[in-house]
Amino acid sequence: MPSSSLAIRESPKLLKAQGSLLIAEPMKGVSYGEVVEVVLGSGETRLGQVIDVSRDATIIQVFGGVSDIDLKISKVRYRGETLKLPVSIDMLGRIFDGLGRPIDGGPPIVPEDYLDINGSPINPASRLPPSEFIETGISAIDGLNSIVRGQKLPIFSGSGLPHNRIAAQIVRQARVRGKEEKFAVVFAAIGVSYDDAMFFIENFKNYGALENAVAFINTADSPVIERIAIPRIALTAAEFLAWKHDMHVLAILTDMTNYCEALRELSAAREEVPSRRGYPGYMYTDLATIYERAGRVEGKKGSVTQMPILTMPNDDITHPIPDLTGYITEGQLVLSRQLWLKGIYPPFDILMSLSRLMKDGIGPGKTREDHRGVFMQLYSAYAEGVRLRELAVVVGTEALSARDRKYLEFADRFEKEFIGQGEYERRTIEETLDKGWELLAILPEDELKHVRIEHIRKYHPKYRGKTSR
């Protein structure tokens, strides 16, 4: 962190240490979010951040805890600046902790700049609508819930579901179409266990995923304030690569539930009045300051796309965290415990998932001309198959017509062959759409009401490769 141009001031007196908070006497000129140095009697220095200022006291969140701080001999120095991240193009291929410090054994970053981790809001008049397709290599996303550059599309998961494996797969496989386009992934693991942290680190290293990626890892035993800072630090790096180096950046943030739990813990320590289920009333606004940093800006070649991942407590999609996230973001990808128990990976619940901006990123020149019709037909056929599956439980399959049994066959194969794919299997959008046509061939042609006749003649396996094509 650069030295501040402002004079460093010392707090006159420390009043109390509580949890991870340090309470100091009020001091004129101290501002919210200001970085502080806590100097212990031993000479050790810890970073902290001002989280509340009042007439009676200044409350400081300390990185590293306050249990061993002697209030009589320790000092607090106010730096007169907010938390800044040293950024450089050399961050690509590196792994950092929750405060942006290298943890991969490599040399320190030689910064091109120091950027405020809170960023600056994008002028709404300067925003460009998301419109270009990002290929993740996962059929359930690319074919049916396409993500486009500048979008924010979360994954709603549950405890025990394979969201970490999916996140690692997307980091390995994601790319943009077009040889001249520069693409990078910024990955942030928030409050994960040591085992999960090692899974991500080893996975990225072993499969070469770090070549065009930056990883920030925050473990569960790190200070709470780090979990508040890490998504902002990751997005600061993403914005630097996008706006300064014209890269299309996909930012994956997992697990945002841990972030919200840290927000609740910090709110309780400050003795704030709780809102729904104990979370602070400003959680919606706080989440918006993170999610709204995605987008495309007029006059800039790069873009920031967000894919936050969160676990729904008790698989409850009405819980405040997924509920508020859904209000801010542009759709959701929902993981299904039922499909996971069937042995299907990745277990995306197609009927519960939605990408609101998909229509702007598919079609001729973006994916393929038949994409819209294929995804509508697959949705329709799968929904009908699920409905008939429930009916068959009551009346038995023998009572169903030949048409109905075709839809049952389609639904079963759709889950196994289209939604399901290998953890290290990457499908191009063309392979995904061709796989969709293979499954649609199960149904009679007169049932394909959502696809154009000319697309049937061109892509249907019955006609594919014939001269009429």
From Swiss-Prot:
InterPro entries linked to this entry: ATP-synt_VA_C, ATPase_F1/V1/A1_a/bsu_N, ATPase_F1/V1/A1_a/bsu_nucl-bd, P-loop_NTPase, V-ATPase_su_B/beta
Primary location recorded for the protein, binned into one broad class: membrane
Membrane protein topology class: Peripheral membrane protein
GO annotation, biological process: proton motive force-driven plasma membrane ATP synthesis
Intracellular or extracellular location(s): Cell membrane
A Pfam family hit: ATP-synt_ab
UniProtKB keywords: ATP synthesis, Cell membrane, Hydrogen ion transport, Ion transport, Membrane, Transport
GO MF annotation, one: ATP binding
Described purpose of this protein according to its UniProt entry: Component of the A-type ATP synthase that produces ATP from ADP in the presence of a proton gradient across the membrane. The B chain is a regulatory subunit.
Oligomeric form and interacting partners: Has multiple subunits with at least A(3), B(3), C, D, E, F, H, I and proteolipid K(x).
Name recorded for this polypeptide: A-type ATP synthase subunit B
